Amino acid sequence: MKDVQLVIDELVKWLREKVKAAGAKGVVFGLSGGVDSAVVAGICKLAFPSNALGIIMPCHSHPEDEEHARLVAESLDLDIEIVDLTPTFDTMMRSFTIDKSRMAAANVKPRLRMTTLYYYAQNLGYLVVGGSNKSEFTVGYFTKHGD
């Protein structure tokens, strides 16, 4: 348990240093309802108790995901915004005139989330914190310019 606390303390310190160096006031991150985003939320809340914002961004998502994200936010007393990206995604998909591959369509969602996070960050003077983990990097599971 000591080692875990040490890692948490180092991450909190690192986040504070990065935010200060950027002249920012806090952090914003996606809150999906999954384990990775819950860990990010907890660390961000420790680093910035009053300036951490979780964005819940459903897009053809399971209702349980939003419920889990809300439970995480509630347990951490975390400020949240909910931005339903479903209508935006659907409008984009309808407007494309070329055949749509499943992979290309699937990659639109993380890019919409990224755009949303940076919108909030710029308006609030915050930095975006990502939730990628080592195993995702190891296997190459990510979307270029995604969240």
Residue ranges and their predicted role:
Residues M1-T143:
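ATP-dependent adenylation/nucleotidyltransferase module used to activate substrates
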Residues G146-D147:
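Gly/Ser/Thr-rich active-site loops/lids in small-molecule metabolic enzymes
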